[in-house]
Amino acid sequence: RRQRQMCIRDSIWGTAFVAQSVGSDYMGPYTFLASRSWLACAFLLGLMAVLRKMGKTNPAAEPGFWQNKKVLLRGGIFCGVALFAASAAQQMGIGTTSTAKAGFMTALYVVLVPVAGVFLGSRPGVKLWCCVAASVVGLYLLCLAGRDTLSLTGGEWQLLVCAILFTAQIMLVNHFSPQLDGIQLSFVQFFVVSVLSTIFAFVFEAPSPDQFRACLLYT
């Protein structure tokens, strides 16, 4: 079941690069990020209500609709800030480079996460490192081989920063998620992303209602 869920997630993640690339031609990165994040919040809020009625919550969390409120707030803010920074860097990078290169460089967190884990005290086994190496080779063959060259220009640097920030976000989620309901943590972090990206959009860009409507189609 978990393998199927990961395959579905990766399919959505991969196809989103095309939508992000097209969307970057019509609106700024913060406007695009704000639109898709508010849409994610609305979806997750409805999903939380449905799952609550079905009784599917994290048994490790305390009772009540909003479970482990203090940890949820703290975790949501930390994860949300990291997700905002990573997503903004990704959207900026996608606007200046190819989607294939963006996919490869963003996915470098596959390498960075176990490396970060070593510094935090975990000891990945040989099997994991072999899987990491195979993943990087596979990503290169899928995204870049015979199609593009890898060079660190402006957009590529932004995508490298994006991979580092996604690594931090994954490590934060890994820290907080055992204590919380996963859907609620996702909602709070996307709410943080929505608020921050909306503020940045109005400060650094000139968003319009038409741009928000168009972005909903892309996301």
At which residue positions do the language-model features occur?
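Juxtamembrane C-cap of transmembrane helices in multi-pass membrane transport proteins
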Residues: T15-M27, F32-S35, L39, S87-T97, ...
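C-terminal transmembrane-helix exit sites in multi-pass transporters
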Residues: F43-M48, Y109-C130
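Cytoplasmic-side transmembrane-helix entry/capping segments in multi-pass membrane proteins
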Residues: L72-G76, P124-S135, E156, D181-Q189
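Hydrophobic transmembrane alpha-helices of multi-pass small-molecule transport proteins
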Residues: L44, P124-A145, A163-F166, S197
